[in-house]
Amino acid sequence: MATTSKKTGSKKSKRNVPNGVVHIQSTFNNTIVSITDTSGEVISWSSAGASGFKGARKGTPFAAQTAAELAARRALEQGMRQIEVLVRGPGSGRETAIRALQVAGLEITLIRDVTPLPHNGCRRPKRRRV
């Protein structure tokens, strides 16, 4: 009888990527940090929810800092040194995520705000009255 070998998950290959792009999407409810190489292939990612925060605490600056540290640690293991930072969204975790990337040991060469702005597109939802 022929025996088949069991696959126990996918083994990620360690590649040496010195330069990369960090995409920080910061909303009011969550912060998502994706680190890619220059061609756009994702090397590591993390979010406030994936870092263990739930509910309203996902939108805090501390949750964004924790998510950025986790993603940066994984990128440093792949050999990344220099990064460009693209920030999108109005959330409170923007600055703290950038600061956490710097403290983790990544050299930031560029910070760009790529928040999409409508040129008077769709009608906005009505204002909340609390």
Curated annotation (Swiss-Prot):
The keyword RNA-binding applies. PROSITE patterns: RIBOSOMAL_S11 (PS00054). GO terms for molecular function: rRNA binding; structural constituent of ribosome. One of its GO terms (cellular component) is ribosome. The keyword Zinc-finger does not apply. It holds the Pfam family Ribosomal_S11. One of its GO terms (biological process) is translation. InterPro entries: Ribosomal_uS11 (IPR001971), Ribosomal_uS11_bac-type (IPR019981), Ribosomal_uS11_CS (IPR018102), Ribosomal_uS11_sf (IPR036967). Keywords: Ribonucleoprotein, Ribosomal protein, RNA-binding, rRNA-binding. Belongs to the universal ribosomal protein uS11 family. Part of the 30S ribosomal subunit. Interacts with proteins S7 and S18. Binds to IF-3. PANTHER family: 40S RIBOSOMAL PROTEIN S14/30S RIBOSOMAL PROTEIN S11. Located on the platform of the 30S subunit, it bridges several disparate RNA helices of the 16S rRNA. Forms part of the Shine-Dalgarno cleft in the 70S ribosome. This is Small ribosomal subunit protein uS11. The lineage of its organism: Bacteria, Bacillati, Cyanobacteriota, Cyanophyceae, Synechococcales.
